[in-house]
Amino acid sequence: MSQPIYKRILLKLSGEALQGEDGLGIDPAILDRMAVEIKELVEMGVEVGVVLGGGNLFRGAKLAKAGMNRVVGDHMGMLATVMNGLAMRDSLFRADVNAKLMSAFQLNGICDTYNWSEAIKMLREKRVVIFSAGTGNPFFTTDSTACLRGIEIEADVVLKATKVDGVYDCDPAKNPDAKLYKNLAYAEVIDKELQVMDLSAFTLARDHGMPIRVFNMGKPGALRQVVTGTEEGTTIC
């Protein structure tokens, strides 16, 4: 088996990646497949942190446009990430993976409150740590959470799992001739206005020299290929 090129990673999974063909909720089969792929990394000795989005359950920004207070909507979105985190933790447990769910705010009896030193300790013990509830503050996306937690836990890379094979020069769903980039510099992404993640999250990663790899989690084995150095997806650094 190929050896991993990363010791510690932060895996960002969108909420949409968890939903099935009906476009709603959580597809247990997808969740279980992701748990098995994460287990492969743990068995290779990789330390894994996970951030989940909540868009499969709730999108606060859309309701904000309809008149809901943005702060209230974002709080609801944070709770959606906790629900996804609970589902992921359960799938990991069933795959015999030791996992800990942490929330950015207190949810006594449901999960632990985020604590940096405790998270580091658990990662060193090869436990998967799931970071939920975003940053705990409104107006910040889960991409920002992924970059923030990745920097805090001193991850080697932020792996952004998407439904496409990496970063393209235009939308591949609309243009079959879209060009896939293999490597990009931070400045290129900004200059070309490429859609990798929101600007706040991206500049946070850039300012702290945190590499980002964008890949298609829908491809079986893609996560392992990324971690073992196979030319999969797009690398930004």
UniProtKB/Swiss-Prot annotation:
Its EC number is 2.7.4.22. It catalyses: UMP + ATP = UDP + ADP. Coiled coil: none annotated. One of its GO terms (molecular function) is UMP kinase activity. One of its GO terms (cellular component) is cytosol. Pathway: Pyrimidine metabolism; CTP biosynthesis via de novo pathway; UDP from UMP (UMPK route): step 1/1. InterPro entries: AceGlu_kinase-like_sf (IPR036393), Asp/Glu/Uridylate_kinase (IPR001048), Uridylate_kinase (IPR011817), Uridylate_kinase_bac (IPR015963). It comes from the Bacteria. GO terms for biological process: 'de novo' CTP biosynthetic process; UDP biosynthetic process. UMP binds at residues 54, 74, 135-142. Residues 20-25 are annotated as: Involved in allosteric activation by GTP. Allosterically activated by GTP. Inhibited by UTP. ATP binds at residues 12-15, 55, 59, 162, 168, 171. Keywords: Allosteric enzyme, ATP-binding, Cytoplasm, Kinase, Nucleotide-binding, Pyrimidine biosynthesis, Transferase. Its main location: cytoplasm. It is found in: Cytoplasm. NCBIfam families: pyrH_bact (TIGR02075). Homohexamer. Catalyzes the reversible phosphorylation of UMP to UDP. Belongs to the UMP kinase family. This is Uridylate kinase. It comes from Haemophilus influenzae (strain PittEE). The lineage of its organism: Bacteria, Pseudomonadati, Pseudomonadota, Gammaproteobacteria, Pasteurellales.
